[in-house]
């Protein structure tokens, strides 16, 4: 059984126009605060060496408060300046795993979730994996699962733009892949995998700019979305000595997400086109170097260009260019009798790239972060005694 309390997190969004003489006219001045209480429990039961049954339950209690100093016209009948909502979310699942042979594993999961007073349909999933070769640990995997996602509180109520008419996403996903792992214990390890996936989602929830005289976004349901692609992952770890360790991880994704549903209007040209702000290609490489209690991490990311409109028009405002991102982090670990501690310093956007992830909203240049992590050793001393 585990539990935690997530700290209060705040976000702000301000949009103002310069009307001259140093005066600003605020169009939007929104503040959003949320925190979460969480409890989780799980158990497992073996029957011989071939059957394993597991059960898990996760309970979240979300609290969200949003205020806007500007009065937002949500519809023609009322005006709101924010919202204050709480929602209980419960997720329960049971899984049966069976190994009929030494090389073959099969499992079935049944999951059901509650959002407020609404229960989802039963959500099944089936998984299979087969050890092709013990040499190189070459393994084939496949799965079929049902998808169901309820709108978040921000999807429903965020000011400005929340949409209380949203319906849940639903659909099916299929994937298959192959993986390998080789190495020598205490010296090095090398692993990799390739996965193909194919998803068909009804009522995909997508935030889109409203356009016209409005300056904010609103989530809408897209009737039918086909998301598919290939993901490649690889990792290498090396013990340089007793005190030095080196690690390298990389991934590449090709992930088209195409609208296959109904047009929103007569002039809608989104059918058969990539969803706005969803990159088709992305990649990341992370390097790690550890010496005693010191940790150095370097991360490089790539995101391909993204369209800003459902028409996928190649115009000045119809897409945002690709960008590269470089981050570096240095961390020092400490250990006390009562807690494990770490101090971390990070440099984000190391080369001060000029880029945007959303049209017209420049992202920060080089910036710096400092973290202090404290993990109390509650009960550990007693357990040793």
Residue ranges, per PLM feature:
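Short loop/turn motifs that connect adjacent beta-strands in outer-membrane beta-barrel proteins
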Residues: 46-52, 102-103, 133-138, 183-190, ...
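Transmembrane beta-strands of outer-membrane beta-barrel pores
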Residues: 3-11, 59-65, 88-90, 110-116, ...
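Membrane-embedded beta-barrel scaffold of Gram-negative outer-membrane proteins
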Residues: 2-14, 131-133, 139-141, 168-228, ...
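C-terminal beta-signal and adjacent terminal beta-strands/loops
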Residues: 302-311, 321, 327-385
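Residues that define the transmembrane beta-barrel architecture of outer-membrane proteins
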Residues: 33-37, 84-90, 120-122, 170-174, ...
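Outer-membrane beta-barrel translocator domains and adjoining extracellular loop/strand segments
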Residues: 10-24, 66-74, 118-124, 153-159, ...
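Face-selective signature of the C-terminal outer-membrane beta-barrel domain
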Residues: 1-119, 127, 131, 193-196, ...
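Gram-negative outer-membrane beta-barrel transporters
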Residues: 99-104, 196-200, 221-308, 338-340, ...
